[in-house]
């Protein structure tokens, strides 16, 4: 068994030992109240003496049959003194016998002293117990976790509407025995070992403590080699410092420090358990556990001489301590099974004590809690007209702002205000006709810790002291003398209070106060509670009900938690997540999702598990027409040379993908297909074949498994691709490299078994022989397809559904999916618990509802749509619930957000199966399609489950009805089983969404001519019923669009001529204006000039010319520049279209001829004529399209040239495929630097020169042959996947040598 496993077993056994050690009595269910004397019962008030609390024993009929208070309100309570600290495991209640008085709900509070009460909580929420429904039945409650206390209070919350509060009670439990030590802040216990050194591999320390201050050392031990362990309170939190010293201490940092807990200075008991086995440590404070491993190499803890508890004594200096000592009580202190306090009580010689006693002495401090931000206040009387003022108190809060004190000073000396603003303390004295006096002190006083405040004034001088630090006290001087006030308002002012005795320039205080002194006299807050001193509103007296809402931290994915008194906030900056609790990823889950948003190829972050624990991963998304590829790069994708590696000294390379193994696994599992190229170039270096069967090279994949097959082969077969194809150089072997030849060869192929990918390491062992050399290359991880994005199911009956395991989402739940339907209503999904549930449904054609109940009653978030959602289109739904809010998003409609209550139940407890498309009752089922269903980032495979479920079919057709609008510029949406694609055949653009421009650089002599099908017969009286094959040539309309960029005028942009010597020309005249010129046989020359500026200005311009019948519209740069109606036009029988220079001898008017002389120099993009894209045809289909190119034509991006001089733009555009694969039989010269590489380079240059000479000769021969080509043509059969527009227009010659395309090198 490995070390981590041993550690886990050891810690588990330690936990069982600890449980056995601390258990006091397994039969802990005895009745504790029935034998108590009458004096053990007290209450807030009593209706009559016959209704006193002494009659509140269960099943008793004495007096009036139970306790009832004077007034029935939430300030009443019944208190029981159980005589000693006991363990309480249950309670029971009854109403007042024979009456209409009973309590329907209540809370419990407990205390050791009858002061400083604590409310019983469950899941950090004050637990509300269900009471009675009549006067005599008994309602029992067994506590989820027991309480150890002497005093117990029942606090009624609600009671019978037709009666009053009435109560009889019983408490169940048993005696509780413990060993307690009281530390006064100046003492400690020392536990000395029997030997000089205590060396341990396993330690278990357990204790309970109650602290009177926020700092102090609980225990400490250290050794001479640097080992130490320290547990101490720091600002109300518990810190464990541990160092397992080793010999390399000076070279490594083995110190480990972990902090846990909060508000531990509240004078209540807190439990601690520390379990260590070697480096593995479990640190538990109350219910919160943190698991961690210590740093360094050592496994054992060496402590010299002794352990100290309560402080760290300085050797040789009795009574002197290194850090602040602990002030409070420690109970049941065990160190590795030794009861330290018991040894001390029995005065064992190994225990040395300071001023330590063995009972817990606690000060009778009464805190109060200001509950409301608007109504809470405490009014206490002062001693008026005293010369001077003295007020002091302590406070703690999470709120940055709040009024602490307001009073009107006597003798017209003004008003005194003390308040928090932005976490800083401000004291303000203001008086009419005098400048206000202001003092500001402190920062971050809303940190939840106790802060003391002391205000002293004498005559004209006032002093403000914060946290008893006299050295930093602030002083101010007033014009008038200061006299003590009559009334002091703490925390706020009464409602509608306009008297100047209480002023509040800020919100009311929410927090706790204690130790209030006015005029140097302490104020008894119990008298306030009894109504005999001052006044108050919305206070909890005798308890500080502060709660750390950031413990545990419910901000996910590393979000930073901050809080106020009523809620918490999450800072999601630098987390890659968003939302109220940083739950939702800001990135998509796959490249497929980015494509769905209309994105094009680029680097993106993807978050494969969405809101799950895995972080985002940077990938390259290659979004093409047919597949969407995801590429994950690693640290070494180039060709790498290897020499000198043998079995004793192998060559090893590990790959870093800048991601975790879990992230890569999620990407691979989500994809339909994955691959990695593996190339091994070898010269006398074998790959797989060895005499004993152990290969010379191998690779390591997922799960750290060693694999013995190479690229192009299959798992379990120790072969290369050529072995499967039976094409190896030497047929005796299964790899080319295994032939062990002196010349370079290679074995290259794809590794495509997903369960083995990615490649994490490669090992090579055969390059240490004479003249032996190898070079390897492992390409990036490539995957395509998102198995979930189009994963869908069709629900055909209302009774059909899919069921999945229970959805576990106690504190955070997000549900997202797409749906389409024609039904009026139906439940998308439902999961039930005993009382809790979660449901998403379409209630009406325009209404989606998300319903949830976590125990506080149902909550519904509803989104109303202005248009019906049952339109058989895909719609997106995202429902989310966290501790702060419940929300529902439908498509891009406004999100519906409901804030969660600050208190109450918050854990969603579900236990039934998850029903998708229906309910457990088989009613209100959904009819339609659901796809891409995610729950908390996890993907549910609807298709696989639908294959085995009657009434449900896998998949759902009809994606183009929703996503067809993503195909732009004339592209057509094509349905696919798992999605859709855009067919850009009928578009001048290309790309996955037909949005990418097709553009090229023209020089003065560049000419592109597109030849249309010749009409038959060539006559203007040709029947309109001629074959459809002539439709393009005889049409009587123009739909022209193109973009251009140039710095030259005049220029000929576009020329269209007919078989009847008519033409249409688009030119730039000498002054840069745009002209559209029609030459018609009837009307002669018609000229339309757009003279709105110089269009030869090195900027991109977009031109659209539309003529339908007699109406002509010319639009430039999205603005209609001209409209014209022809009297008559008959522009048909199109012969050809030319971009740039017209090279044939054609009749041109002088202006067109002049422009043609200059041709066109610049960039032209996305040219469209009716349904023909001549520029795209020239660049993409030169061998099959009826297009001729003359001069230099270089594909380029016009937008990239806008800042460049088009006269000198000569950079050739290269559209490199990031997934391009090279099929080389030798290593790349830039990777393998050897003499053979240099020779190869020289040979390549010579070959290149020879090809250039051949190309030039071919050009002249081709031009000569073109001049004498036959005018007769023969129709050719085209491939089926060719664009349909080309099939009708292409006119090819009989042989390839007679193609109309002209090439230039």
UniProtKB/Swiss-Prot annotation:
Tissue: Expressed in brain.
UniProt domain F5/8 type C: residue ranges: 23-174
Domain Laminin G-like residue range list: 180-360, 367-544, 791-956, 1017-1198
Residues in compartment: Extracellular: 23-1236
Role of this protein: May play a role in the correct development and proper functioning of the peripheral and central nervous system and be involved in cell adhesion and intercellular communication.
Biological process according to GO: cell adhesion
Disulfide pairings: 329-360, 512-544, 550-561, 555-570, 572-582, 929-956, 960-973, 967-982, 984-994, 1163-1198
InterPro entries, sorted: ConA-like_dom_sf (IPR013320), EGF-like_dom (IPR000742), FA58C (IPR000421), Fibrinogen-like_C (IPR036056), Fibrinogen_a/b/g_C_dom (IPR002181), Galactose-bd-like_sf (IPR008979), Laminin_G (IPR001791), Neurexin-related_CASP (IPR050372)
Family membership noted in the UniProt record: Belongs to the neurexin family.
Protein name in the entry: Contactin-associated protein-like 5
Domain Fibrinogen C-terminal: 584-790
PROSITE patterns associated with the record: EGF_3 (PS50026), FA58C_1 (PS01285), FA58C_2 (PS01286), FA58C_3 (PS50022), FIBRINOGEN_C_2 (PS51406), LAM_G_DOMAIN (PS50025)
Entries under PANTHER family matching the protein: CONTACTIN-ASSOCIATED PROTEIN-LIKE 5, PIKACHURIN-LIKE PROTEIN
Phylogenetic classification of the source organism: Eukaryota, Metazoa, Chordata, Craniata, Vertebrata
